[in-house]
UniProtKB/Swiss-Prot annotation:
Gene Ontology annotations of biological process type: L-leucine biosynthetic process
Listed name of the protein: 3-isopropylmalate dehydratase small subunit
Top-level taxon: Bacteria
Gene expressing this chain: leuD
Species name: Roseiflexus castenholzii (strain DSM 13941 / HLO8)
InterPro entries membership: 3-IsopropMal_deHydase_ssu, Aconitase/3IPM_dehydase_swvl, AconitaseA/IPMdHydase_ssu_swvl, IPMI_Swivel, LeuD
Record note on quaternary structure: Heterodimer of LeuC and LeuD.
GO cellular component labels: 3-isopropylmalate dehydratase complex
Length: 204
């Protein structure tokens, strides 16, 4: 994982609500454990037609959407079955963050643990972002993890929630295992200071 501090990038809006993980990445792509190549399957049923040709009407296939790194998605994004391949596919495509009024809990947890920032905003900010993209597809926003803010082109800022432990891990670019490894000395010191068996008054 790479440290996340400030993400500055163009947005692309996919405002449909209740986009589930099967729509994000079809089940046939779940047979692999290698993250490479999963970008091909991202929103496959929408990006391609029945013959496998790109659908020119889908937003990600439009020229103005190329290079966007921040996805603005509808409510309850990532609902459905749990699959780490969903955030992997989004990252493989080039997305560094997803902004939505709400996320499915399992998707949000999987995304954050894999270094994909999920930004939950209020409805007003979300609607403004969707409108900005429709008016100007080159719109850029700034996401500051340290201050937990999203800055819009007009300077307006909106805060987003994130738990302190996850925030720390993302800022440091480590996962839960990496955090434990960083605390190895403290863990060893604790174990050395405590007996392997807890003394009680209970009879064996």
């Amino acid at each position: 994982m790479h440290p996340i501090s400030i993400i500055t990038g163009r947005i692309v809006a996919l405002p449909a609500h209740d986009i589930d993980t099967d729509q994000i990445i079809p089940a046939r792509y779940l047979k692999v454990t290698d993250k490479s190549g999963l970008a091909e399957g991202l929103f496959y049923a929408w990006r391609f037609d029945a013959e496998g040709k790109p659908n020119p009407d889908f937003v990600l296939n439009r020229p103005e959407a190329q290079g966007a790194t921040i996805l603005v998605a509808g409510r309850n994004f990532g609902c459905g079955s749990s699959r780490e391949h969903a955030p992997w596919a989004l990252q493989g495509y080039g997305f560094k963050a997803v902004i939505s009024p709400s996320f499915a809990d399992i998707f949000r947890n999987n995304a954050l643990k894999n270094g994909l920032l999920t930004v939950q905003t209020d409805e007003e900010t979300w609607q403004q972002l969707v409108s900005l993209f429709e008016e100007d597809p080159t719109t850029e926003v700034i996401i500051d993890l340290a201050t937990q803010t999203v800055t819009l082109p007009d300077g307006r800022q909106a805060r987003f929630p994130i738990d302190p432990f996850t925030k720390h891990c993302l800022l440091q670019g480590i996962d839960q295992m990496g955090f434990l490894l960083n605390e190895e000395d403290a863990i060893s010191a604790y174990e050395s200071a405590h007996p392997p068996r807890v003394v009680t008054t209970a009879r064996s």
